[in-house]
Amino acid sequence: MIFITGCTGLVGSHLTASLVNRQQTTDNSRDVTPVASDVTNIASDVTLVESKRIIKLLCRKNSDLSLLKRVLARYGYNDIPENIEFVYGDVTDYDILEEAMKDADEVYHCAAVVSFDPSDKKSLMRVNVEGTRNMVNAALQCGVKKF
């Protein structure tokens, strides 16, 4: 399973579409039909047949998904692909992150607050520092292979 934060932003939406597209391309390029005369390779061929990996996207309940949908459309997906699951929460909520990552082998952390307004310092520190710390700690706790 793949877990992505920041899917509604510029980088996260393109990363999501790229990973969905990579899976589609990989799935379509496989020829996994076992050849009857090659019985010894049937087991290895069958292991290539896998369902598309689930991609879990962390987003807030009030998130605007319009950018993500537009980017997916540019990659040829008119609807949210069926292997995408939404996890509603925030990177500052460690428990949600740990639960979402428990089966993840890849995690991509793209969530951030971007602002040049000095009055946003508290929010910047909370999301960008505390949120990233939570992401790293949850990934370590869950044994994520790729972060």
Where are these regions (language model features)?
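N-terminal Rossmann NAD(P)H-binding glycine-rich loop of SDR-like oxidoreductase domains
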Residues: I2-R22
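A structural signal for isolated positions on well-ordered beta-strands in alpha/beta enzyme cores
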Residues: I54-K56, E85
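Conserved Rossmann-fold NAD(P)-dependent oxidoreductase catalytic core, especially the SDR/UDP-sugar
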Residues: E130-F147
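Short, basic, low-complexity termini and linkers enriched in Ser/Thr/Gly/Pro
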Residues: T16, V20-V49
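NAD(P)H-binding glycine-rich loop region in Rossmannoid oxidoreductase-like domains
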Residues: D79-E130, A138
